[in-house]
Amino acid sequence: MTESVLDYMTRLGRAAREASRVIGRASTAQKNRALQATAAALDEARAELSAANALDLANGQANGLEPAMLERLALTPARIDSMIVGLRQVAGLADPVGAIRDMSYRPSGIQVGKMRVPLGVVGIIYESRPNVTIDAASLCLKSGNATILRGGSEAIHSNRAIAACIERGLAEARLPAAVVQVVETTDRAAVGALITMPEYVDVIVPRGGKGLIERVSRDARVPVIKHLDGICHVYVSAHADLAKAQKIAFNAKTYRYGICGAMETLLVDQTIAADFLPAMAAQFREKGVELRGCERTRDLIDVIPATEDDWHTEYLAAILSIRVVSGLDEAIEHINHYGSHHSDAIVSDHQSQIRRFMAEVDSSSVMVNAPTSFADGFEYGLGAEIGISTDKLHARGPVGLEGLTCEKYIVIGDGQLRGQA
Protein backbone atom coordinates (compact mmCIF):
# COMPACT_ATOMS: atom_id res chain seq x y z
CA MET A 1 0.00 0.00 0.00
CA THR A 2 2.81 2.40 0.89
CA GLU A 3 4.43 1.79 -2.50
CA SER A 4 1.22 2.60 -4.34
CA VAL A 5 0.80 5.80 -2.31
CA LEU A 6 4.38 6.76 -3.15
CA ASP A 7 3.76 6.10 -6.85
CA TYR A 8 0.54 8.12 -6.69
CA MET A 9 2.21 11.10 -5.01
CA THR A 10 5.10 10.94 -7.47
CA ARG A 11 2.60 11.19 -10.34
CA LEU A 12 1.00 14.22 -8.70
CA GLY A 13 4.40 15.80 -8.18
CA ARG A 14 5.50 15.22 -11.75
CA ALA A 15 2.23 16.64 -13.10
CA ALA A 16 2.48 19.65 -10.79
CA ARG A 17 6.01 20.40 -11.94
CA GLU A 18 4.90 20.36 -15.58
CA ALA A 19 1.84 22.49 -14.79
CA SER A 20 3.96 25.01 -12.87
CA ARG A 21 5.70 25.94 -16.10
CA VAL A 22 2.34 26.75 -17.68
CA ILE A 23 0.80 28.70 -14.80
CA GLY A 24 4.11 30.49 -14.22
CA ARG A 25 3.86 32.17 -17.61
CA ALA A 26 0.06 32.61 -17.66
CA SER A 27 -1.24 36.15 -18.03
CA THR A 28 -2.97 37.96 -15.20
CA ALA A 29 -6.19 37.92 -17.24
CA GLN A 30 -6.01 34.15 -17.68
CA LYS A 31 -5.42 33.56 -13.97
CA ASN A 32 -8.25 35.91 -13.03
CA ARG A 33 -10.55 34.14 -15.46
CA ALA A 34 -9.83 30.83 -13.72
CA LEU A 35 -10.58 32.39 -10.33
CA GLN A 36 -13.83 33.96 -11.47
CA ALA A 37 -14.91 30.75 -13.21
CA THR A 38 -14.18 28.75 -10.06
CA ALA A 39 -16.32 31.17 -8.07
CA ALA A 40 -19.17 30.66 -10.52
CA ALA A 41 -18.72 26.88 -10.36
CA LEU A 42 -18.96 26.95 -6.56
CA ASP A 43 -22.13 29.01 -6.76
CA GLU A 44 -23.68 26.52 -9.18
CA ALA A 45 -22.58 23.49 -7.14
CA ARG A 46 -24.02 24.52 -3.76
CA ALA A 47 -26.20 21.41 -3.54
CA GLU A 48 -23.31 19.08 -4.37
CA LEU A 49 -21.02 20.84 -1.89
CA SER A 50 -23.61 20.62 0.88
CA ALA A 51 -24.27 16.94 0.19
CA ALA A 52 -20.56 16.08 0.25
CA ASN A 53 -20.08 18.07 3.43
CA ALA A 54 -23.06 16.37 5.08
CA LEU A 55 -21.36 13.03 4.45
CA ASP A 56 -18.15 14.29 6.09
CA LEU A 57 -20.09 15.64 9.07
CA ALA A 58 -21.96 12.37 9.51
CA ASN A 59 -18.72 10.41 9.38
CA GLY A 60 -17.14 12.85 11.80
CA GLN A 61 -19.94 12.45 14.32
CA ALA A 62 -19.77 8.68 13.99
CA ASN A 63 -16.01 8.80 14.57
CA GLY A 64 -16.35 10.98 17.66
CA LEU A 65 -14.93 14.24 16.34
CA GLU A 66 -15.03 17.01 18.93
CA PRO A 67 -17.72 19.71 18.48
CA ALA A 68 -15.07 22.35 17.73
CA MET A 69 -13.66 20.17 14.95
CA LEU A 70 -17.13 19.55 13.53
CA GLU A 71 -17.78 23.29 13.55
CA ARG A 72 -14.62 23.93 11.53
CA LEU A 73 -15.56 21.12 9.17
CA ALA A 74 -19.02 22.49 8.37
CA LEU A 75 -19.57 24.11 4.96
CA THR A 76 -22.49 26.36 5.80
CA PRO A 77 -24.16 28.52 3.14
CA ALA A 78 -22.36 31.51 4.67
CA ARG A 79 -18.99 29.77 4.30
CA ILE A 80 -19.71 28.89 0.69
CA ASP A 81 -20.57 32.57 0.17
CA SER A 82 -17.28 33.51 1.83
CA MET A 83 -15.30 31.19 -0.46
CA ILE A 84 -16.95 32.74 -3.52
CA VAL A 85 -16.25 36.27 -2.28
CA GLY A 86 -12.67 35.28 -1.45
CA LEU A 87 -12.01 34.02 -4.97
CA ARG A 88 -13.32 37.26 -6.46
CA GLN A 89 -11.24 39.31 -4.04
CA VAL A 90 -8.06 37.45 -5.00
CA ALA A 91 -8.90 38.03 -8.66
CA GLY A 92 -8.99 41.74 -7.85
CA LEU A 93 -5.56 41.80 -6.19
CA ALA A 94 -2.50 43.11 -7.98
CA ASP A 95 -0.49 40.35 -9.65
CA PRO A 96 3.05 40.31 -8.20
CA VAL A 97 4.48 38.08 -10.94
CA GLY A 98 6.75 39.87 -13.39
CA ALA A 99 7.09 43.05 -11.34
CA ILE A 100 10.54 44.62 -11.79
CA ARG A 101 12.20 46.87 -9.23
CA ASP A 102 15.50 48.53 -8.32
CA MET A 103 16.81 48.83 -11.87
CA SER A 104 20.06 50.76 -11.86
CA TYR A 105 23.04 51.37 -14.14
CA ARG A 106 26.40 49.99 -13.04
CA PRO A 107 29.76 51.59 -13.93
CA SER A 108 30.20 48.94 -16.63
CA GLY A 109 27.08 50.21 -18.38
CA ILE A 110 24.88 47.21 -17.60
CA GLN A 111 21.51 47.59 -15.88
CA VAL A 112 20.77 45.39 -12.86
CA GLY A 113 17.42 44.87 -11.17
CA LYS A 114 15.08 42.28 -9.74
CA MET A 115 12.02 40.51 -11.14
CA ARG A 116 9.38 38.78 -9.02
CA VAL A 117 8.68 35.17 -10.08
CA PRO A 118 6.62 32.23 -8.73
CA LEU A 119 8.13 29.72 -6.31
CA GLY A 120 7.04 26.82 -8.55
CA VAL A 121 5.13 24.03 -6.79
CA VAL A 122 3.63 24.62 -3.34
CA GLY A 123 2.51 21.69 -1.19
CA ILE A 124 -0.10 22.57 1.43
CA ILE A 125 -1.07 20.25 4.28
CA TYR A 126 -4.04 21.21 6.42
CA GLU A 127 -6.71 19.84 8.73
CA SER A 128 -10.49 20.03 9.02
CA ARG A 129 -11.52 23.24 7.30
CA PRO A 130 -12.47 22.59 3.66
CA ASN A 131 -12.57 26.33 2.92
CA VAL A 132 -8.75 26.27 3.16
CA THR A 133 -8.82 24.34 -0.13
CA ILE A 134 -10.15 27.43 -1.87
CA ASP A 135 -8.00 29.91 0.07
CA ALA A 136 -4.81 28.03 -0.75
CA ALA A 137 -5.70 27.23 -4.35
CA SER A 138 -6.64 30.82 -5.16
CA LEU A 139 -3.48 32.35 -3.72
CA CYS A 140 -1.20 29.81 -5.36
CA LEU A 141 -2.94 30.20 -8.71
CA LYS A 142 -2.82 34.01 -8.67
CA SER A 143 0.87 33.97 -7.70
CA GLY A 144 1.66 31.67 -10.63
CA ASN A 145 2.30 28.49 -8.64
CA ALA A 146 1.03 24.97 -9.09
CA THR A 147 -0.17 23.43 -5.84
CA ILE A 148 -0.77 20.03 -4.28
CA LEU A 149 -3.37 20.17 -1.50
CA ARG A 150 -3.51 17.49 1.17
CA GLY A 151 -6.51 18.13 3.41
CA GLY A 152 -7.59 16.16 6.44
CA SER A 153 -9.23 12.77 5.95
CA GLU A 154 -12.30 14.05 7.81
CA ALA A 155 -12.98 16.53 4.95
CA ILE A 156 -12.22 14.25 2.01
CA HIS A 157 -15.68 14.38 0.39
CA SER A 158 -15.96 18.15 0.77
CA ASN A 159 -12.48 18.66 -0.68
CA ARG A 160 -13.25 16.44 -3.65
CA ALA A 161 -16.40 18.45 -4.39
CA ILE A 162 -14.45 21.71 -4.15
CA ALA A 163 -11.69 20.27 -6.35
CA ALA A 164 -14.25 19.52 -9.06
CA CYS A 165 -15.24 23.20 -9.07
CA ILE A 166 -11.61 24.30 -9.28
CA GLU A 167 -11.05 21.92 -12.20
CA ARG A 168 -13.99 23.49 -14.03
CA GLY A 169 -12.55 26.94 -13.44
CA LEU A 170 -9.13 25.93 -14.74
CA ALA A 171 -10.67 24.33 -17.82
CA GLU A 172 -12.62 27.47 -18.64
CA ALA A 173 -9.38 29.46 -18.50
CA ARG A 174 -7.63 26.79 -20.59
CA LEU A 175 -5.18 25.95 -17.84
CA PRO A 176 -4.06 22.40 -16.98
CA ALA A 177 -6.02 20.59 -14.28
CA ALA A 178 -2.70 19.80 -12.58
CA VAL A 179 -2.28 23.48 -11.65
CA VAL A 180 -4.35 22.59 -8.56
CA GLN A 181 -4.41 18.97 -7.39
CA VAL A 182 -6.21 17.69 -4.31
CA VAL A 183 -4.74 14.49 -2.85
CA GLU A 184 -7.49 11.87 -3.10
CA THR A 185 -6.08 9.29 -0.70
CA THR A 186 -6.56 9.53 3.07
CA ASP A 187 -3.47 7.39 3.71
CA ARG A 188 -1.12 9.30 6.00
CA ALA A 189 1.83 8.06 3.96
CA ALA A 190 0.82 10.72 1.42
CA VAL A 191 2.07 13.42 3.78
CA GLY A 192 5.43 11.71 4.15
CA ALA A 193 5.77 11.46 0.39
CA LEU A 194 4.73 15.06 -0.26
CA ILE A 195 7.30 16.55 2.12
CA THR A 196 10.19 14.47 0.76
CA MET A 197 9.94 15.25 -2.97
CA PRO A 198 12.31 18.21 -3.52
CA GLU A 199 12.54 17.33 -7.20
CA TYR A 200 8.84 18.14 -7.59
CA VAL A 201 7.86 20.38 -4.64
CA ASP A 202 9.56 23.71 -3.89
CA VAL A 203 7.98 24.60 -0.55
CA ILE A 204 5.58 23.10 2.01
CA VAL A 205 3.03 25.10 4.01
CA PRO A 206 1.53 23.11 6.92
CA ARG A 207 -1.64 24.50 8.51
CA GLY A 208 -2.91 22.63 11.52
CA GLY A 209 -2.09 21.47 15.01
CA LYS A 210 1.30 21.55 16.64
CA GLY A 211 1.81 17.82 16.13
CA LEU A 212 1.37 18.12 12.36
CA ILE A 213 3.69 21.11 12.08
CA GLU A 214 6.37 19.50 14.25
CA ARG A 215 6.27 16.35 12.13
CA VAL A 216 6.52 18.29 8.87
CA SER A 217 9.35 20.46 10.20
CA ARG A 218 11.26 17.40 11.43
CA ASP A 219 10.85 15.16 8.39
CA ALA A 220 10.64 17.52 5.41
CA ARG A 221 13.32 17.57 2.73
CA VAL A 222 11.61 20.62 1.26
CA PRO A 223 11.68 24.18 2.70
CA VAL A 224 8.77 24.82 5.10
CA ILE A 225 6.83 28.03 5.77
CA LYS A 226 5.20 27.66 9.17
CA HIS A 227 4.59 28.73 12.73
CA LEU A 228 4.37 26.31 15.64
CA ASP A 229 2.53 28.36 18.25
CA GLY A 230 0.82 31.67 18.75
CA ILE A 231 1.94 32.57 22.27
CA CYS A 232 1.14 36.27 22.01
CA HIS A 233 1.58 38.96 24.68
CA VAL A 234 0.25 42.41 25.45
CA TYR A 235 2.44 44.57 27.70
CA VAL A 236 0.68 47.43 29.50
CA SER A 237 3.42 49.89 30.38
CA ALA A 238 3.59 52.47 33.15
CA HIS A 239 2.97 55.11 30.47
CA ALA A 240 -0.22 53.57 29.09
CA ASP A 241 -3.66 55.12 28.87
CA LEU A 242 -5.35 52.56 31.12
CA ALA A 243 -8.81 52.88 29.56
CA LYS A 244 -7.29 52.29 26.13
CA ALA A 245 -5.17 49.45 27.49
CA GLN A 246 -8.21 47.68 28.94
CA LYS A 247 -10.02 47.76 25.59
CA ILE A 248 -6.93 46.56 23.71
CA ALA A 249 -6.22 43.69 26.10
CA PHE A 250 -9.85 42.58 26.10
CA ASN A 251 -10.03 42.52 22.30
CA ALA A 252 -6.66 40.77 22.03
CA LYS A 253 -7.98 37.89 24.12
CA THR A 254 -11.69 37.66 23.37
CA TYR A 255 -12.04 38.63 19.69
CA ARG A 256 -11.62 34.94 18.90
CA TYR A 257 -9.99 32.50 21.29
CA GLY A 258 -8.95 30.03 18.59
CA ILE A 259 -6.89 32.31 16.34
CA CYS A 260 -3.10 32.23 16.46
CA GLY A 261 -3.02 35.97 17.19
CA ALA A 262 -5.04 35.70 20.41
CA MET A 263 -3.28 37.04 23.51
CA GLU A 264 -2.28 34.24 25.88
CA THR A 265 -0.27 36.27 28.44
CA LEU A 266 -0.94 39.78 29.75
CA LEU A 267 2.10 41.60 31.15
CA VAL A 268 1.38 44.56 33.42
CA ASP A 269 3.87 47.12 34.72
CA GLN A 270 4.10 47.04 38.51
CA THR A 271 3.62 50.82 38.68
CA ILE A 272 0.05 50.68 37.39
CA ALA A 273 -0.91 47.08 38.24
CA ALA A 274 -3.00 47.99 41.30
CA ASP A 275 -4.99 50.54 39.30
CA PHE A 276 -5.35 48.41 36.19
CA LEU A 277 -5.82 44.78 37.16
CA PRO A 278 -9.03 44.82 39.28
CA ALA A 279 -11.19 46.37 36.55
CA MET A 280 -9.46 44.34 33.84
CA ALA A 281 -10.01 41.10 35.73
CA ALA A 282 -13.68 41.93 36.32
CA GLN A 283 -14.23 42.43 32.59
CA PHE A 284 -12.53 39.14 31.74
CA ARG A 285 -14.51 37.26 34.39
CA GLU A 286 -17.77 38.67 33.06
CA LYS A 287 -16.80 37.19 29.68
CA GLY A 288 -16.03 33.81 31.29
CA VAL A 289 -12.24 33.95 30.92
CA GLU A 290 -10.29 31.87 33.44
CA LEU A 291 -7.43 33.89 34.91
CA ARG A 292 -4.08 32.56 36.11
CA GLY A 293 -1.46 34.78 37.64
CA CYS A 294 1.99 35.14 39.14
CA GLU A 295 2.50 35.82 42.85
CA ARG A 296 2.45 39.60 42.41
CA THR A 297 -0.77 39.31 40.42
CA ARG A 298 -2.35 37.19 43.17
CA ASP A 299 -1.51 39.91 45.70
CA LEU A 300 -3.85 42.21 43.78
CA ILE A 301 -6.63 39.98 42.42
CA ASP A 302 -8.00 36.51 43.14
CA VAL A 303 -6.72 34.22 40.37
CA ILE A 304 -5.47 30.65 39.94
CA PRO A 305 -1.70 30.37 40.54
CA ALA A 306 0.20 30.33 37.24
CA THR A 307 2.84 27.64 36.74
CA GLU A 308 5.96 27.70 34.59
CA ASP A 309 4.04 25.71 31.97
CA ASP A 310 1.45 28.47 31.65
CA TRP A 311 3.99 30.92 30.25
CA HIS A 312 4.80 28.37 27.51
CA THR A 313 1.18 27.52 26.64
CA GLU A 314 -0.96 28.51 23.65
CA TYR A 315 -4.39 28.00 25.21
CA LEU A 316 -6.62 28.71 22.19
CA ALA A 317 -9.35 28.91 24.82
CA ALA A 318 -10.90 31.28 27.37
CA ILE A 319 -7.83 31.12 29.62
CA LEU A 320 -5.36 33.94 30.26
CA SER A 321 -2.09 34.13 32.19
CA ILE A 322 -1.17 37.42 33.87
CA ARG A 323 2.26 38.52 35.05
CA VAL A 324 3.25 41.73 36.81
CA VAL A 325 6.67 42.90 35.59
CA SER A 326 9.11 45.46 36.92
CA GLY A 327 9.25 47.40 33.68
CA LEU A 328 10.06 47.35 29.99
CA ASP A 329 13.26 45.31 30.36
CA GLU A 330 11.49 42.45 32.13
CA ALA A 331 8.59 42.58 29.68
CA ILE A 332 10.90 42.26 26.66
CA GLU A 333 12.91 39.53 28.36
CA HIS A 334 9.74 37.56 29.15
CA ILE A 335 8.37 37.87 25.61
CA ASN A 336 11.61 36.84 23.93
CA HIS A 337 12.07 33.90 26.33
CA TYR A 338 8.54 32.48 26.48
CA GLY A 339 6.96 33.81 23.28
CA SER A 340 6.67 32.07 19.93
CA HIS A 341 7.89 35.04 17.83
CA HIS A 342 4.39 35.47 16.43
CA SER A 343 2.72 38.75 17.48
CA ASP A 344 3.26 40.89 20.57
CA ALA A 345 1.96 44.30 21.60
CA ILE A 346 2.82 47.25 23.82
CA VAL A 347 0.35 49.80 25.15
CA SER A 348 2.27 53.00 25.90
CA ASP A 349 2.42 56.71 25.11
CA HIS A 350 6.18 56.89 25.74
CA GLN A 351 7.96 57.11 22.37
CA SER A 352 11.39 55.87 23.46
CA GLN A 353 9.72 52.85 25.13
CA ILE A 354 7.78 52.16 21.96
CA ARG A 355 10.90 52.34 19.80
CA ARG A 356 12.78 49.96 22.10
CA PHE A 357 9.89 47.50 22.13
CA MET A 358 9.61 47.53 18.33
CA ALA A 359 13.37 47.05 17.92
CA GLU A 360 14.02 44.46 20.62
CA VAL A 361 10.97 42.18 20.60
CA ASP A 362 11.87 39.31 18.26
CA SER A 363 8.47 38.66 16.70
CA SER A 364 7.09 38.57 13.17
CA SER A 365 4.55 41.28 14.08
CA VAL A 366 4.92 43.96 16.76
CA MET A 367 1.86 46.04 17.63
CA VAL A 368 1.82 49.47 19.25
CA ASN A 369 -1.42 50.51 20.95
CA ALA A 370 -3.28 47.85 18.99
CA PRO A 371 -4.32 44.27 19.86
CA THR A 372 -2.52 41.17 18.61
CA SER A 373 -5.81 40.04 17.08
CA PHE A 374 -4.91 42.26 14.10
CA ALA A 375 -2.27 39.69 13.03
CA ASP A 376 -3.99 38.72 9.79
CA GLY A 377 -3.21 39.08 6.11
CA PHE A 378 -6.52 40.75 5.28
CA GLU A 379 -6.04 43.30 8.08
CA TYR A 380 -2.53 44.02 6.79
CA GLY A 381 -3.81 44.81 3.32
CA LEU A 382 -2.52 41.60 1.74
CA GLY A 383 -6.04 40.65 0.65
CA ALA A 384 -5.64 37.10 1.91
CA GLU A 385 -2.98 34.89 3.43
CA ILE A 386 -1.73 31.34 3.07
CA GLY A 387 -0.60 31.35 6.70
CA ILE A 388 1.64 33.20 9.15
CA SER A 389 5.36 32.49 9.30
CA THR A 390 7.46 32.95 12.43
CA ASP A 391 10.63 31.95 10.59
CA LYS A 392 13.10 34.54 9.33
CA LEU A 393 14.07 33.14 5.94
CA HIS A 394 12.02 33.96 2.84
CA ALA A 395 8.75 35.01 4.47
CA ARG A 396 7.92 36.37 7.94
CA GLY A 397 4.50 37.30 9.27
CA PRO A 398 1.30 36.86 7.22
CA VAL A 399 2.16 35.27 3.87
CA GLY A 400 0.14 36.63 0.96
CA LEU A 401 0.67 36.64 -2.79
CA GLU A 402 4.12 38.23 -2.62
CA GLY A 403 5.23 35.66 -0.04
CA LEU A 404 4.46 32.94 -2.58
CA THR A 405 6.95 34.45 -5.00
CA CYS A 406 10.67 35.14 -4.94
CA GLU A 407 13.00 37.42 -6.85
CA LYS A 408 15.60 36.79 -9.49
CA TYR A 409 18.19 39.24 -10.75
CA ILE A 410 17.89 40.52 -14.29
CA VAL A 411 20.88 42.03 -16.07
CA ILE A 412 20.47 44.08 -19.25
CA GLY A 413 23.37 45.09 -21.42
CA ASP A 414 24.16 46.33 -24.91
CA GLY A 415 27.22 44.30 -25.73
CA GLN A 416 29.32 45.28 -22.71
CA LEU A 417 32.09 42.81 -21.79
CA ARG A 418 33.44 42.23 -18.31
CA GLY A 419 36.96 43.54 -17.88
CA GLN A 420 36.65 46.01 -20.74
CA ALA A 421 36.00 49.68 -20.08
UniProtKB/Swiss-Prot annotation:
Molecular function (GO) terms listed? glutamate-5-semialdehyde dehydrogenase activity; NADP binding
Homology family = Belongs to the gamma-glutamyl phosphate reductase family.
Sorted alphabetically, which Pfam families does this protein's record hold?
Aldedh
Free-text function comment from the UniProt entry: Catalyzes the NADPH-dependent reduction of L-glutamate 5-phosphate into L-glutamate 5-semialdehyde and phosphate. The product spontaneously undergoes cyclization to form 1-pyrroline-5-carboxylate.
* NCBIfam families hit by this protein: PRK00197.1 (NF001221), proA (TIGR00407)
InterPro entries found in the cross-reference section: Ald_DH/histidinol_DH, Ald_DH_C, Ald_DH_N, Aldehyde_DH_dom, G-glutamylP_reductase_CS, Glu-5-SA_DH, GPR_dom
What EC number(s) does this enzyme carry?
A: 1.2.1.41
A single cellular component GO annotation? cytoplasm
Pathway field of the UniProt record reads: Amino-acid biosynthesis; L-proline biosynthesis; L-glutamate 5-semialdehyde from L-glutamate: step 2/2
Q: What is the lineage of its organism?
A: Bacteria, Pseudomonadati, Pseudomonadota, Gammaproteobacteria, Pseudomonadales
By what name is this protein known? Gamma-glutamyl phosphate reductase
- Kindly give the PANTHER family that the UniProt entry links to this protein: DELTA-1-PYRROLINE-5-CARBOXYLATE SYNTHASE, GLUTAMATE SEMIALDEHYDE DEHYDROGENASE
Q: Which reaction does it catalyse?
A: L-glutamate 5-semialdehyde + phosphate + NADP(+) = L-glutamyl 5-phosphate + NADPH + H(+)
Q: List locations, semicolon-separated.
A: Cytoplasm
Q: Per its UniProt entry, which superkingdom is the organism in?
A: Bacteria
Assign the protein's first listed, main location to one coarse class: cytoplasm
Tell me which UniProt keywords the record has, alphabetically: Amino-acid biosynthesis, Cytoplasm, NADP, Oxidoreductase, Proline biosynthesis
